[in-house]
């Protein structure tokens, strides 16, 4: 794939707890320069990023989409809190929501609870908003990844996503992406996120079935693809 093609698959990400407004603005400026598909920020930075996307574009359309994380990073917020967090993020300008499931439900194989939680968040935002569901796949065997993906699909998600990037168990893996592709490939998007810092690893994820990449080192990764 060419650099520009890969760039459109990237969610350029800044989720550090101490990220400043200045750093978010720098992220957005870099996103516009690189031609990425979206930025991914904390709910408190959505308004700033959404305003920046139009300042970064010379056209009527925004330069990139704005994604907000929800229930991040542990997924243990009450569902009503996640739904309200999603509503407020959309009101501030987010067009994509990356929600963390209650990961214990995936370990306990409580698929109905996962589906219900996702459905409630899905219903809390307009249909045009893209909902991505973070599974924290490093904690799950393949069978649980597959079942969680199917619960996400039943709940109305548009994407499943590997990882928050914050859990010590690890981030995206080829194993997890392949399991996700087995479960919902061709029907839902698959976002690989967490620990992808080289073009080689990005290529591995795309070959395994990823259709979106969550990256903080976007410039370094893109430099490894042909112009």
From Swiss-Prot:
Key words, A-Z: Cytoplasm, Lyase, Schiff base
NCBIfam families named in the record: deoC
Similarity section: Belongs to the DeoC/FbaB aldolase family. DeoC type 1 subfamily.
Name under which the protein is recorded: Deoxyribose-phosphate aldolase
Gene3D superfamilies documented for this protein: Aldolase class I
Pfam families: DeoC
Pathway(s) of this molecule: Carbohydrate degradation; 2-deoxy-D-ribose 1-phosphate degradation; D-glyceraldehyde 3-phosphate and acetaldehyde from 2-deoxy-alpha-D-ribose 1-phosphate: step 2/2
GO BP term, example: carbohydrate catabolic process
Cellular component annotations (GO), alphabetically ordered: cytoplasm
GO MF annotation terms: deoxyribose-phosphate aldolase activity
Function per UniProt: Catalyzes a reversible aldol reaction between acetaldehyde and D-glyceraldehyde 3-phosphate to generate 2-deoxy-D-ribose 5-phosphate.
Enzyme nomenclature, EC number: 4.1.2.4
Subcellular location: Cytoplasm
Top-level EC class: lyase
Keyword Cytoplasm applies: yes
Reaction catalysed by this enzyme: 2-deoxy-D-ribose 5-phosphate = D-glyceraldehyde 3-phosphate + acetaldehyde
SUPFAM superfamilies, per the entry: Aldolase
Domain of life of the organism encoding this protein: Bacteria
Catalytic residues in the record: 98, 161, 191
UniProt source species: Frankia alni (strain DSM 45986 / CECT 9034 / ACN14a)
Chief localization: cytoplasm
InterPro entries per the UniProt record, alphabetical: Aldolase_TIM, DeoC, DeoC/FbaB/LacD_aldolase, DeoC_typeI
